[in-house]
């Protein structure tokens, strides 16, 4: 696709306007607490922005348009499932998590299951989110290389630079500010594009004449089981992710945490629909293109150049903001749950730089890993990420929330260990080809129910 000077200028201004508030917010960061949880003073808007900045990534925009090109409404599951997961998080998890005044998921699990659970949770969450960073980086790398026609090394430099500008100096506050601006850009460009695509297809009547009702207008275009697995995976993945929990920890109080999470859910749910419309429009008018190019090609071809540039900026910020938010989550766990346990006499400035350098290390490590696996499948890393996060975090955390202090600690640790083992080795030891997240959750539930029945007696 050919970009004009107007596209480039509009895109550059969009990136600058989005990055600037976050960089200005960095001036208020004086400690690791300010960096990791915004000094626990975030309002509902910043909580929502932090969540949106990470969850609305390349999968919610480019990936949704790609699947919309192939299957229609089935592609909505990513943002619909994310929104449902965030509503559950707001209803059941936000208040007890914020009330704890902690910083990481591992710290929360330690309160019920002891120190061994903290190490297992740190491994599970860090490894799981790292592979999610890998998946997002792989997508962003090829997107930038294809969009601007630059070599992969130059694309890698752009990814690292923008990722660090988003979170290296300002941490969670910068991520939240960028998230707020990003959603405004998406509504201003991709939503406009989605409505125009819908209108150009002849509205509902024209679409029903051009597409068969199944699979194009069904959420279960690949079957009921596939749809329910998609929903379940999103719930497990969102609730198990440090970055979203970290946003709740940053809220000024429990009510703000719940309201911010709920606001994020209500914004995230409809975000996928315009991308679906654009994907279907491109399938109808350009069936010969590579499906992953559906959204950027539409923005360049069918929108005014200045608006198309804004849309491309929103797409890039979606992909790179997700990487930045996830890297911040992993960096926080490394600095809080590992470095702080080793570097006991660290000063406030030392703790702050430990957090920043952890984010840098995660970003660079993910890029190096991607270059070692350039031909790998994004979906492969997403599956591994989901299995690792869900196996060590989701059900143990859920039992902590619903049955606080009632599960025997040794069984909680056993549940986490067995789940992580299943996530890592199931496909190597089992004759059944199923997603390793399912057996991991079964192992979790088995030990947690025993621990709940056994109780805390004798511990």
Where are these regions (language model features)?
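Membrane-embedded helix-loop-helix hairpins and adjacent transmembrane boundary segments
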Residues: 1-459
């Amino acid at each position: 696709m050919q970009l004009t000077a107007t596209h480039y200028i509009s895109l550059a201004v969009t990136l600058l306007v989005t990055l600037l508030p976050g960089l200005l917010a960095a001036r208020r960061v004086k400690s690791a607490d300010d960096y990791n949880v915004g000094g626990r003073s975030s309002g509902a808007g910043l909580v929502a922005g932090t969540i949106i900045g990470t969850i609305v990534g390349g999968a919610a925009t480019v990936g949704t348009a790609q699947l919309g090109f192939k299957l229609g409404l089935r592609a909505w599951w990513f943002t619909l499932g994310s929104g449902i997961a965030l509503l559950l998080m707001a209803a059941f998890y936000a208040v007890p998590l914020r009330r704890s005044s902690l910083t990481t998921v591992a710290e929360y699990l330690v309160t019920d299951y002891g120190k061994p659970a903290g190490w297992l949770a740190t491994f599970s969450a860090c490894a799981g989110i790292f592979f999610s960073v890998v998946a997002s980086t792989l997508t962003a790398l090829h997107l930038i290389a294809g969009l601007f026609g630059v070599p992969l090394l130059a694309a890698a430099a752009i990814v690292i630079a923008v990722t660090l500008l988003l979170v290296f100096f300002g941490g969670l506050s910068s991520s939240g500010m960028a998230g707020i601006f990003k959603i405004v850009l998406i509504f201003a460009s991709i939503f406009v594009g989605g409505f125009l695509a819908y209108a150009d297809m002849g509205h509902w009547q024209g679409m029903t004449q051009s597409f068969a009702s199944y699979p194009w207008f069904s959420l279960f275009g690949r079957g009921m089981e596939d749809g329910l697995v998609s929903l379940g995976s999103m719930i497990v993945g969102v609730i198990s992710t440090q970055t979203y929990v970290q946003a709740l920890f940053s809220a000024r109080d429990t009510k703000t945490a719940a309201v911010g999470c709920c606001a994020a859910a209500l914004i995230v749910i409809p975000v996928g629909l315009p991308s679906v419309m654009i994907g279907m429009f491109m399938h109808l008018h350009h069936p010969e293109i590579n499906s992953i190019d559906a959204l950027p090609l539409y923005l360049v071809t069918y929108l005014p150049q200045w608006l198309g540039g804004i849309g491309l900026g929103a797409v890039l910020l979606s992909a790179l903001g997700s990487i930045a938010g996830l890297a911040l989550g992993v960096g926080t766990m490394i600095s809080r749950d590992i470095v702080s346990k080793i570097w006991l006499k660290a000063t406030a400035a030392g703790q702050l730089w430990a957090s920043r350098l952890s984010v840098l290390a995660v970003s660079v490590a993910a890029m190096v890993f991607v270059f070692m696996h350039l031909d790998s499948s994004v979906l492969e890393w997403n599956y591994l990420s989901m299995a690792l996060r869900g196996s060590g975090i989701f059900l143990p955390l859920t039992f902590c929330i619903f049955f606080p202090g009632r599960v025997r600690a040794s069984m909680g640790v056993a549940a986490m260990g067995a789940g992580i083992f299943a996530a890592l080795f199931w496909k190597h030891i089992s004759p059944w080809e199923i997603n390793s997240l399912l057996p991991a959750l079964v192992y979790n539930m088995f030990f947690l129910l025993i621990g709940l029945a056994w109780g805390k007696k004798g511990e």
